[in-house]
């Protein structure tokens, strides 16, 4: 930190012209950062709604594949991560590879949505949206992609719904054996052990007796929490900006990523109940099944082609936490891969774009139907 401040002072006391340019850029970033944001420039149309959710459609540059690629977004984030920069956009990349792309945008959830839970998404919203997508794309089947919490959503949807219309399933950075997820996994395991010593408290927590208004978390807390979970990445990003104030591209990228991280959306209380107290604390998916209310969902019901990915440097959901999914389904076509980057970088980093996006394209190409107009 001291080194970074020293370098900054050296820059700001350098040649007058250079100094003026750097001070101007620093001022733009601090006071007019919104004007520097580059995200969500790829054109799309809305082809359907489900309550506050929207189905975005991004047409292929030249359609090569019958099955569309459907991105299901995690809750709490805005959609920028899928279309971050004009020159490095996940959505734009796959439309250029010949896929019609659809994105499930959950909209701006708020306190009034505090009762929403996993089943509202995997048993209601996602099935409805997939029916709309199948009709719009004129394809019986789809390729379904989920990252982070959305990876859990698409996994449980595919296991629960029959028929599910999923030809190819992609699950990235999603905790399957939560206790194996580094330090945070050990913490959840320890908390679960402590709770098991007091049956009354355990029942209150695990059976939904805590009011959803208490469990509901506003977007600003989610934004702070995301940064706390990766303080090194947050610090390094600011340090690189301060050391390279004359780099116009870096200035735009810092503002764009900052805009994404600073504008998170609420987590409904019911979803926090299912994610924190079920997925993370009880770790049911390690055994291949989860109980949500009166429904037991078994991963062995999944038999489609399955690609599982984990970030090489992901400290939130480690590779050891993700990989067990490889052994829990009835798919005869399972691929596990490590992706450059951490929990966010596996979706958006330059290394992921250079290495993983082409690999995913090839994987889908080998498992998709050629489109005939």
Model regions and ranges:
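Short, surface-exposed "cap/lid" segments of acyl-processing enzymes
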Residues: 42-110
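Alpha/beta-hydrolase-fold enzymes
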Residues: 1-12, 135, 139, 154-267
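Gly/Ala-rich beta-loop-alpha elbow adjacent to hydrolase catalytic centers
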Residues: 145-154
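Short beta-strand/loop motif that positions the catalytic acidic residue
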Residues: 302, 308-310, 314
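Short beta-strand immediately N-terminal to the catalytic nucleophile in serine-hydrolase-like folds
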Residues: 144-146, 172, 309
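Catalytic histidine-centered segment of alpha/beta-hydrolase-like enzymes
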Residues: 316, 341-355
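Short alpha-helix in the alpha/beta-hydrolase fold that links the catalytic acid
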Residues: 304, 318-327
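Alpha/beta-hydrolase active-site loop
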Residues: 116-134
């Amino acid at each position: 930190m001291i080194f970074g401040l020293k370098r900054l002072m050296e820059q700001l006391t350098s040649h007058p012209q250079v100094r003026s340019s750097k001070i101007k850029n620093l001022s733009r970033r601090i006071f007019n950062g919104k004007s520097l944001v580059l995200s969500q420039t790829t054109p799309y149309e809305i082809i359907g709604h489900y309550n506050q959710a929207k189905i975005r459609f991004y047409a292929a540059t030249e359609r090569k594949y019958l099955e569309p690629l459907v991105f299901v977004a995690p809750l709490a984030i805005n959609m920028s991560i899928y279309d971050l920069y004009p020159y490095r956009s996940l959505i734009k990349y796959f439309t250029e590879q010949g896929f019609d792309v659809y994105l499930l945008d959950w909209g701006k959830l708020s306190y009034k949505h505090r009762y929403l839970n996993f089943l509202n998404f995997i048993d209601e919203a996602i099935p409805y949206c997939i029916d709309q997508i199948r009709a719009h794309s004129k394809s019986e089947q789809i390729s379904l992609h989920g990252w982070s919490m959305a990876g859990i959503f698409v996994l449980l949807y595919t296991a629960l719904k029959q028929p599910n219309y999923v030809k190819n399933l992609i699950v990235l950075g999603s905790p399957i054996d939560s206790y194996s997820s580094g330090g945070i996994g050990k913490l959840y395991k320890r908390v679960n052990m402590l709770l098991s010593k007091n049956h009354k408290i355990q029942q209150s927590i695990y059976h939904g007796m805590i009011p959803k208004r208490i469990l509901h978390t506003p977007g600003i807390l989610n934004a702070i929490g995301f940064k706390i979970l990766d303080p090194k990445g947050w610090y390094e990003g600011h340090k690189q900006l301060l050391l390279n104030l004359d780099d116009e591209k870096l200035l735009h990228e810092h503002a764009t990523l900052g805009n994404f991280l600073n504008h998170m959306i609420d987590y409904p209380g019911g979803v926090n109940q299912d994610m924190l107290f079920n997925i993370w604390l009880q770790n049911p998916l390690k055994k291949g099944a989860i109980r949500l209310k009166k429904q037991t969902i078994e991963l062995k019901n999944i038999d489609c082609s399955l690609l599982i990915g984990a970030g090489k440097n992901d400290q939130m959901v480690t590779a050891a936490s993700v990989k067990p999914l490889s052994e829990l389904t009835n798919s005869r076509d399972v691929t596990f891969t490590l992706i450059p980057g951490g929990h966010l970088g596996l979706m958006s980093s330059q290394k992921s774009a250079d290495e993983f996006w082409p690999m995913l394209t090839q994987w889908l190409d080998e498992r998709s139907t050629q489109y005939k107009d």
